[in-house]
Amino acid sequence: MSNSCHQCSHCHNQLCLHKVPIFNGLNHEDMLKISDLIQHKTYKKGESIFSLGDNLDSIVIINVGSVKAYKYTPEGREQIIYLFSEGDFFGEQYLLSKRKAAFTVEALEMVNVCMLSKEHFQALLLQYPDMGVKIIEELGSRMFRLEHFMESMGVRNIDLRINTLLLDYSEKFGSKVEEGILIRLPLSREGMANYLGIARETISRKLSQLESDGIIRSISNKAIIILDITSLEEGNEGVL
């Protein structure tokens, strides 16, 4: 855990809880009880929330910002496994076992998180069994997304990999605007290239081609608008 964290001064416990699906269904009184158990911390861009091999003692909820979960391949290349953003949680699987962290989680920007200790988390699972069911559902959803990603990585056609990534981003990080879907990209071009296992120059060239084709429009290095999401979806049909 980073030693440079400090108390979050502008987020509220209940706000964190309402963003997380596993707490859905709890009444106001229960929410207040749980909110008293939560600790807030802030991490700067580039700081690690935890590292590969750490013993974890808390479930972490993203209140503001986004993080990447990654590890290095035997060749020394960074491989991003998950991206977590507002309302997502992680670390729960390690609180239910004695395993150490299988990846490092690093802030992609200024991040505010809410932390619930292992002891409190386990007590809540006993008190609210529905939480356990929702955690299993979330883990299943993550496994499905990971399998979908691995399937797309097995496709040699780089265009299809990039299409899949943009479609995933539109669902997780996109917001509707007049022209289409605005995506605040969580990763740089280099990060996206690492995620897909391709060269940075390749993804820059392919994104430029999509822009020339009128499918996307680049706003900045950190934002694009998908103008024609149907073309991306049709490009993936019958492949994944």
Where do the model's predicted regions map?
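Cyclic nucleotide-binding regulatory module and flanking cytosolic helices
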Residues: 1-45, 90, 94-96
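Cyclic nucleotide-binding regulatory domains
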Residues: 22, 47-110
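A generic structural signal for short hydrophobic patches within well-formed alpha-helices
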Residues: 31, 121-122, 232
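Cyclic-nucleotide recognition modules
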Residues: 82-144
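Short helix-to-loop capping/linker segments positioned immediately adjacent to catalytic or ligand/cofactor-binding
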Residues: 122-126, 145-155, 175-176
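N-terminal positioning helix adjacent to the helix-turn-helix/winged-helix DNA-binding module
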Residues: 154, 158-161, 165, 188
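Phosphate-/nucleic-acid-contacting segments
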Residues: 171-240
